[in-house]
Amino acid sequence: MMNRMNRAGRLWWGGLWLLLAAFASAEEAKTTANNPPKKADAGDFIRVRRDAKKTPLAMETAIVHYVPADKGKKSPTVDLVSAFHIGEKKYYEELNKAFENYDVVLYELVAPLGTRVPKGGGNKDSMLSKVQKFMKDTLALEFQLDQIDYTKANFVHADMSAADIAKSMSDKGETWMTIISRMMSYSMAQQAKNGGDDGSMELFAAFFSKNRPLALKRAIANQLEVNDTLSALEGPDGSTLISGRNAIALDVLKKQIAGGKRKIAIFYGGGHMPDLDKHLRADFGLKPGGTRWLTAWDLNDKAVEKKE
């Protein structure tokens, strides 16, 4: 019975990580970082903030500000704005306000070149939309495409189309099945390395919690700190889903800089950021100049804490 529960738990978590990877590109939040190291990791862009008792208080994403390494230059500046695609309404309101201050915001969206997202999101009847609605309702959160205003004049599409992804994957010998298998195998190996805890018991308890959305979000936050499944995609030649799409964004960045834009944001999932960081340093002569953290998920139940 317990073995069946554990297997079911692994399958559930494996499926959840694939969904979160698709929606959020989130990776392991390893450390806090006021001054990102020479080689950035995912913890510089997405982290779980905890109290002294190690209770998760917030899932946070970073806006990392890059400035010219040459002290004689003041521009261009580029901000890597990490996206968590399921979040609090207030989180997206903060992002919308921040985006008003940029000359241009380069955004990810697997769609034909130049695609614009209408206000309130796109097609609500698609299978993906139904999955999103289920997750939104279960976690009591909002979705990025519904809340971010992509109609603003300074928003520029900077991503592959589905056809581009299919061609790139074919050229690299990648398939969706091999990607899924690689990610799940890596995730299970990491679970074994961490004592075999797949989070199934915490998840099971969360479903029966008086505050189910909060309990589920905390369970997911705990798992994000022991899962780095997207790193399994990147090999010596990179991958379509990370470095391939990043290459498109960086090409658009070059064109925007050449066109005179000086204050630029790249709005992409956190899993893309270590590779983008590497290229901003090596190819654009930029370095991190500061980090601002935003709360994507509020995991603090003040009412419960007062009772305890």
Predicted segments with their positions:
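Bacterial N-terminal signal peptides that target proteins for export
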Residues: 2-13
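Bacterial N-terminal signal peptides
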Residues: 13-22
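Sterically constrained small-residue positions within well-ordered secondary structures
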Residues: 17, 55-57, 257
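Structured, acidic catalytic/metal-binding patches in enzyme active sites
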Residues: 29-240, 244, 289-299, 304-305
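A cross-kingdom marker for long, charged
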Residues: 239, 243-308
